[in-house]
């Protein structure tokens, strides 16, 4: 009998339905997700690729000789036993498993298609992002290349501490030099009180050039508390400062008693300093002939001016204590070289000589008194203008005084002299200051209607320096004469004598005072 071929393990028979399902699944897996509208050419290319994937890798074609060799080997193996055939069958099963693995590979092909799909969208965007990252920002390059201004300025500028140290050394050296120079001065006691010897009466320092106020260095104000050490510089200044008067024009110091005897005229530069109204009475009138008038008229608060920090009534009371006056003007009658006259003197130290309702009323009553008695009249002007705390009432005093002066000058036998001192501004300049029969002014007096600062702020123009001084205005014909303070009394007596006002002897003066007292 012929040996029968042993049958290996039978492969599972797959029904037609399962085969069709597998074919359908394979087709769907191979086709993958449908891409948006593709052209016919792309569709043909995809079909070609799918066919190759289905067929899988082509097996090499074996020739007839190789087939015969394989059959011969199988016959030899039959003689050896069934073990080899069973091994081959297992190998075939492994091959079947590999076929399943090929199906997995087909799934991998779909994954490759997904990667291709991702490359089309994501990779393109990513390349753009890379291009943006590769290009450096201009702002960053400019910021890195340009050095910071603060660093350059900081490197170029020297340290403040070094500069301050150098300045201190220079100041100390200057102080030592000045102290050595001042040791030889016989007025050494003067320099202990005022280290800067601008006002030193010694000949070595009298010819020293004056420095204008604008060019001088500002010195911080010192505390009013006196030091415990009586020999210290601060204590000397606080103890003896009330004995000296500082001249702003030449920065000189004048001893008060000497300055008063010279009618407040600076010894160094001859400038006319501000003068108290009581001192002017002593300057212009004969001794013991002054008789004040209308002292009972006092300032009230007619418009109830509101001020939280400094109420109007309190401010008036404080100026009364400081100056010893009841208002910004003193009015009365007296004798100048035995000539009986009426006189009014404004005081700038009382609220800047501002003209309020009481000031206007006193001047008006003085003018009316001179009109009734046919007396010559003198008004000394020193004012900053109308008093703002009284509003329109202070402005009305300009019209009231001008009206009284019009009645006074209607009589041709009387004579009105206006004396303008520094400063005379505002409503006083615009009213009785410029209505005199003769207008006199002191040297270098500041006379204007509006101040320099106000004009520059309102009109936006520059006011020339010196355009508001008495000398400049005299050249323009605004005044009749500029009279210094010392010969003022003699000049006034000549004017009165020239206009027919004769001097009276002592007996006539006594009778006149008895009748009109």
Curated annotation (Swiss-Prot):
Transmembrane region(s): none
Reactions it catalyzes: N(6)-carboxybiotinyl-L-lysyl-[protein] + acetyl-CoA = N(6)-biotinyl-L-lysyl-[protein] + malonyl-CoA
Q: List the disulfide bonds.
A: none
The UniProt annotation places Zn(2+) binding at 247, 250, 266, 269
Q: What are the protein's UniProt keywords?
A: ATP-binding, Chloroplast, Fatty acid biosynthesis, Fatty acid metabolism, Lipid biosynthesis, Lipid metabolism, Metal-binding, Nucleotide-binding, Plastid, Transferase, Zinc, Zinc-finger
List residue spans of C4-type Zn fingers: 247-269
One GO process term, biological-process aspect: malonyl-CoA biosynthetic process
Could you tell me what this protein is called?
Acetyl-coenzyme A carboxylase carboxyl transferase subunit beta, chloroplastic
- Protein's organism: Oenothera elata subsp. hookeri
Source lineage: Eukaryota, Viridiplantae, Streptophyta, Embryophyta, Tracheophyta
Q: Which gene encodes it?
A: accD
